[in-house]
Amino acid sequence: MGRPRRRGRDINGVLLLDKPLGLSSNDVLQKVKRLFSANRAGHTGALDPLATGMLPICLGEATKFSQFLLDSDKRYRVVARLGQRTDTSDAEGALISEREVNLTQAQIDTALESFRGESQQIPSMYSALKHQGKPLYEYARQGIEVEREARSITVYELLFIRWEGNDLELEIHCSKGTYIRTIIDDLGELLGCGAHVSYLRRLQVATYPSERMVTLEQLTAMVEAAQAEGRSPNPELDSLLLPMDSAVLNFPEVNLLPSVAAYVKQGQPVHVSGAPSEGMVRITEGKERNFIGIGTIAEDGRVAPKRLVVESVEVENLPVENKK
């Protein structure tokens, strides 16, 4: 007879993890899930093992809103190694060309300017984008080249930080779906010397503050200290979590009276005075402004629930709201 499955906690919130070097995003996710004893967990956009930095991890009901963090802007610090091009466009790949670096600051500045603003980018074959249900990197490892469509991206800011020897350090603020390694590979070809990513750190996702990041070492130390003292680590761990609606704070808020919110919790759209005329909204309830989910503005102006937080208390059946 198998060992009974251990029941996890129904803990909800967003943890800003500082992902370490060398681990995959999924490895880190599973470690955090175990440390928090969480029933459900998901990350919001993978970082390569080579990369470090901000990896928001959604626990419990917060996983329902992780897509909105996937769609948000990101900020990175990257070091490009000039003169060497690799097949993966990073330091883990095989060297495919080596060229002399004979550049001026003016040439670098001119090249960087061409990457600012809106552009079309062809994703790397060593990306997790899927083709016929399989990640592109699996085709690449088999030596198979798959045709990829160019995607619209925006580089809002591209800052020159330093240039020492063959190392060029940049800071990039970009839209969702931007591949930093592709920018560096394209930059190297534009400069005529080739380049690859030797260092990559994600500084920010959406508007989350970097000072709220915690490391796996810090989490592990909290758990071990609590266990050594015979107490639960959960209160200390839970204090690190940001609220669920932190993933959707960019949506305008619609605050409902509890009597109106009851209809929304049953999936019914409601009329709300002063609601936006279109788009997505963040729905809160009562004077405490408790977050209950997100909604959209229907064609008739009503607020229609789209994704709701599950409550432990059942909502009683209510009459259908009069549309008039």
UniProtKB/Swiss-Prot annotation:
Q: Name one GO biological process term.
A: tRNA pseudouridine synthesis
This protein's UniProt keywords:
Isomerase, tRNA processing
Group of enzyme by EC: isomerase
Protein name as it appears in the record: tRNA pseudouridine synthase B
> Which Pfam families does the protein's record reference?
TruB-C_2 (PF09157), TruB_C_2 (PF16198), TruB_N (PF01509)
Query: Catalytic residues per the record?
Result: 48 (nucleophile)
Q: Name one GO molecular function term.
A: RNA binding
Q: Which reaction does it catalyse?
A: uridine(55) in tRNA = pseudouridine(55) in tRNA
Q: Which cysteines are joined by disulfide bonds?
A: none
Q: What does this protein do?
A: Responsible for synthesis of pseudouridine from uracil-55 in the psi GC loop of transfer RNAs.
tRNA processing found in the keyword field: yes
What SUPFAM superfamilies does this protein map onto?
Answer: Pseudouridine synthase, PUA domain-like
- CDD domains found in the cross-reference section: PseudoU_synth_EcTruB, PUA_TruB_bacterial
PANTHER family from the xrefs? Answer: PSEUDOURIDYLATE SYNTHASE TRUB1, TRNA-PSEUDOURIDINE SYNTHASE
**What NCBIfam families does the record tag this protein with?**
TruB (TIGR00431)
- This protein's species is Yersinia pestis
Q: What is its EC number?
A: 5.4.99.25
Record family assignment: Belongs to the pseudouridine synthase TruB family. Type 1 subfamily.
Q: Where does this protein hold substrate?
A: 43, 76, 179, 200
